[in-house]
Amino acid sequence: MTPPPPGRAAPSAPRARVPGPPARLGLPLRLRLLLLLWAAAASAQGHLRSGPRIFAVWKGHVGQDRVDFGQTEPHTVLFHEPGSSSVWVGGRGKVYLFDFPEGKNASVRTVNIGSTKGSCLDKRDCENYITLLERRSEGLLACGTNARHPSCWNLVNGTVVPLGEMRGYAPFSPDENSLVLFEGDEVYSTIRKQEYNGKIPRFRRIRGESELYTSDTVMQNPQFIKATIVHQDQAYDDKIYYFFREDNPDKNPEAPLNVSRVAQLCRGDQGGESSLSVSKWNTFLKAMLVCSDAATNKNFNRLQDVFLLPDPSGQWRDTRVYGVFSNPWNYSAVCVYSLGDIDKVFRTSSLKGYHSSLPNPRPGKCLPDQQPIPTETFQVADRHPEVAQRVEPMGPLKTPLFHSKYHYQKVAVHRMQASHGETFHVLYLTTDRGTIHKVVEPGEQEHSFAFNIMEIQPFRRAAAIQTMSLDAERRKLYVSSQWEVSQVPLDLCEVYGGGCHGCLMSRDPYCGWDQGRCISIYSSERSVLQSINPAEPHKECPNPKPDKAPLQKVSLAPNSRYYLSCPMESRHATYSWRHKENVEQSCEPGHQSPNCILFIENLTAQQYGHYFCEAQEGSYFREAQHWQLLPEDGIMAEHLLGHACALAASLWLGVLPTLTLGLLVH
């Protein structure tokens, strides 16, 4: 990558020296030790590495990895079958079929499904927003708002087959929070069937053996996030788990406004024996999901998204549940739970606020042979639906995997095996800025931590990410915005510069060094060089020392204003400008500007000479830039003056905010 050139400003008179800060007072030894221990603990948790190490713009291959909609799509839904090169996207009155064949140009076909209802009060209400796409035996099921008359269609070999109005399959408005879950011939939904009544949200079985719904009192203004069916050891014990957040029943002013929950239902629930319970779920229980860090006193109580990663051995209890949470300041945390822990909480916990002996069978217990739940058991669970025990994250500390100042909204996780055989879990998290963070979960090594590898810009034009789907077979990520659909590789090894050291310092388990290139482990038939030492990966390279930066020279007149700019390729490194063994400027990790800039306000004779921009990242040290400032001669001055005039506008405007901030701080 070509670094931005240094810039020059007009000469100025010398400035009076400003007194430096007062001498630093010594801290007591005990306090210094406590601060060191706190810093070490924070580093071990990975919070200091929660920001992305590098920033990458995914340009893709021309014509192959991005396709525009051709119109603005404010609401999209994406359907992708693992291993397929095709992606279905539902939009406004249309269903798009994108095809991304390997190594060939992408294509798009459009199926029009316009509104069939002509009368509507608002133009926006006249649209048919497709909100559901699902593969069924009859074809691809597409359901939409249809001018506030929710309806469905089957797409069969490019033909649209109307199915008429189907309440519960699509909301009346695309802005409504909704979930629809399919399992065989069964359909579960949180969508209300009537537009102007029944406004209390419910979780329903709308197709199956018997229609059921949750009691109106067991949830308070829920926002549904995810639902799944878990097949347990006995078929009658199969569970429906759904994740949501709701208003906090604790009205203490210091209590959070929202709490995050997981609810359980028995899939074989047939309703109750009494008139009050015959049409209701009789096995509903809910538990609080905890995602907090006691060491920093940070609580994250707003669940944003959930991703379930099944265990490769097929053990349902070892399924990992990744939850993305936020707090009122839109900082985020990722907490990981196990289905086994969730199941144990529901099986063994007492009920919150209930102090008598539990009835038999206990609330939430699934019964064999589709037996109805006794009325007493239903009444206790209906009045006390929350279990007392909370669901805590996995691990001995019961803390978040990591937390971050970024606002994450969606998550997908890929389990992969590196070249040396170690298994990694790689998280892909969307931000509210329309980017994707690629984070490696800590391994089993001592002192390992979550590592944020990079931030990816997936679109041609910046926009919010509406949908995301991960294909583990093709190793692709599919994301959509209001403008386009993009196919992003999971590896992206070509973005790492700096030779072998830069490749291994990325700590990207998808990438390795082979035959002078940083390549994907999937593109090589033999084992590639990867680091097995997460603390000092650069030491695995054949040449232990990175190459020195090439010397660049510039001639300047005395008393000139000038700046030297060094691109901060790694945001986890400290960049320093050194001149005659003195550090003139230092830019720490988290520095807001993409460049570390040394501003020379008034060039004196002592300030001519060699300037080195040096990057320090752990034990890895490299020389990023090397400049020599020379006294100006007539010929060189004329050449440089012309060059500076040509670049003055763009360069000066680009660095002016950073220079202003630097001068104010100075």
Curated annotation (Swiss-Prot):
Q: Indicate whether RNA-binding appears among the record's keywords.
A: no
As for membrane topology, the entry says: Lipid-anchor; GPI-anchor
| Chain positions found as Asymmetric dimethylarginine | 135
The entry assigns this protein to a family as follows:
Belongs to the semaphorin family.
Q: Where is the composition biased (Low complexity)?
A: 9-21
Q: Which PANTHER family match?
A: SEMAPHORIN (PTHR11036), SEMAPHORIN-7A (PTHR11036:SF80)
Q: Name one Pfam family in it.
A: Ig_2
Q: List the disulfide bonds.
A: 120-126, 143-152, 266-366, 291-335, 493-511, 500-541, 503-518, 566-613, 587-596
Give residue ranges for domain Ig-like C2-type.
Answer: 544-629
Task: Give the main localization category.
Answer: membrane
Q: What is the protein named?
A: Semaphorin-7A
- List UniProt keywords, sorted A-Z: Cell membrane, Developmental protein, Differentiation, Disease variant, Disulfide bond, Glycoprotein, GPI-anchor, Immunoglobulin domain, Inflammatory response, Intrahepatic cholestasis, Lipoprotein, Membrane, Methylation, Neurogenesis, Signal
Disease field: Cholestasis, progressive familial intrahepatic, 11: An autosomal recessive form of progressive cholestasis, a disorder characterized by early onset of cholestasis that progresses to hepatic fibrosis, cirrhosis, and end-stage liver disease.
Compartment(s): Cell membrane
The organism of origin for this protein:
Homo sapiens
Sema domain boundaries: 53-490
User: Propeptide spans which residues?
Assistant: 649-666
Mark the residues modified by lipid (GPI-anchor amidated alanine). Answer: 648
The signal peptide, as residue positions, is 1-44
Q: What does this protein do?
A: Plays an important role in integrin-mediated signaling and functions both in regulating cell migration and immune responses. Promotes formation of focal adhesion complexes, activation of the protein kinase PTK2/FAK1 and subsequent phosphorylation of MAPK1 and MAPK3. Promotes production of pro-inflammatory cytokines by monocytes and macrophages. Plays an important role in modulating inflammation and T-cell-mediated immune responses. Promotes axon growth in the embryonic olfactory bulb. Promotes attachment, spreading and dendrite outgrowth in melanocytes.
Renumbered residue ranges of the record's region Interaction with integrins: 267-269
Q: Where is this region: Disordered?
A: 1-21
Found, by tissue, as follows: Detected in skin keratinocytes and on endothelial cells from skin blood vessels (at protein level). Expressed in fibroblasts, keratinocytes, melanocytes, placenta, testis, ovary, spleen, brain, spinal cord, lung, heart, adrenal gland, lymph nodes, thymus, intestine and kidney.
Inducers of expression: Up-regulated in UV-irradiated fibroblasts, but not in UV-irradiated keratinocytes.
